[in-house]
Design a protein with these regions (language model features):
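Structured soluble/peripheral alpha/beta segments that form catalytic or ligand/cofactor-binding pockets
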Residues: 1-299
């Protein structure tokens, strides 16, 4: 499926379904500093509301109240684009080159600011793009700076960005892992949807100048004492017949709930893919499954 420059802007709901949603996510992971970040607007135009979560986290600072910065805003007015720029509660996205290059800034005066340039390293990976529903992912290089109450930290890392639009119920039952690794020469994305009676895999392997869809992937997980994924190996194959084995270990973690329907452990991972890559392992649970799992620990 293909995109055009209009897909970099907000989409018009095709139904009056109140849970019709649109997200516009940017992220970064900088192995030199150990810092990861996320900028996550969630729009529900049929309800005329929006939400925003901005977070930066580091090793051993894994909660919203111990992270260097974490703030969520709810019940905001949905933003609109004015030319190539949209603004939402201190966050600004400027489209410098549609589908390829962006200027991301954030201002929480006297507390935290971000000034980042995000450049696509490859074409968008597009599982679906219709007026009714869409999703795509793009590996990026992220360069710029963060400022924590006067302390400036340079950022030079990688990130995935994604866009989604269409109905998204807060009452969905979901168990997902969203996993990626990126360097200047390639990237991979492995998305596992784990249902009670099925397990589906999607994503891609982009290596040696060739991108191909992943057709099989099995993961072997190690967890720490807090049940966070600490190490994982993926073994599988892609549509071109290439077999792969990719192993990574966690550098940091953040307990994050950016929307009512999903909780995730967001973890920076360093991978042995393509002579070294960085990315994230996002361990995603809907609240019902998380509650069931946690209740098993009751005595």
């Amino acid at each position: 499926m293909t995109l055009n420059s209009a897909d970099d802007y907000f989409h018009v709901p095709t139904t009056d379904e109140r849970w019709w949603s649109e997200t516009y996510w940017f992220s970064f992971d900088d192995p030199a500093t150990g810092l990861s970040g996320t900028f996550y607007p969630l729009l529900r135009k049929n309800l005329d509301i929006a939400a925003l979560t901005v977070a930066v986290w580091a090793p051993d600072q894994a909660t919203s109240w111990t992270a260097p910065y974490c703030r969520s805003y709810w019940h905001l007015k949905p933003p609109v684009f004015e030319g190539n720029t949209m603004a939402l509660e201190g966050l600004t996205y400027e489209i410098l080159d549609p589908l390829h290059r962006y200027h991301v800034t954030y201002q929480d005066p006297n507390v935290f600011t971000a000034d980042l340039t995000v450049t696509g390293l490859a074409d968008n990976y597009v599982p679906i793009a219709t007026p009714e529903r869409g999703h795509w992912d793009q590996p990026t290089r992220v360069v710029g700076s963060l400022n924590f109450a006067g302390r400036e930290i340079p950022i030079d890392g990688f990130g995935m960005r994604d866009r989604s639009w269409g109905p998204r119920l807060d009452s969905n039952t979901a168990r997902t892992s969203y996993v990626y690794g990126i360097n200047n020469d390639g990237s991979f994305l492995i998305v596992s949807q784990m249902q009670q009676d099925s397990h589906t895999i999607s994503g891609y392997l982009d290596q040696d100048g060739e991108r191909s869809r992943i057709v099989t992937a099995e993961q072997f997980i190690e967890r720490d004492s807090s049940q966070r994924v600490s190490r994982v190996t993926f073994e599988g194959s892609d549509q071109s017949g290439r077999d792969f084995s990719i192993t990574g270990h966690a550098r940091n973690h953040l307990a994050k709930q950016a929307s009512p329907g999903y909780f995730a452990w967001m973890s920076m991972f360093e991978w042995d893919f393509a002579d070294g890559a960085v990315g994230q392992y996002q361990d995603v649970w809907s609240p019902d499954l998380l509650s069931i799992e946690a209740s098993r620990q009751l005595t």
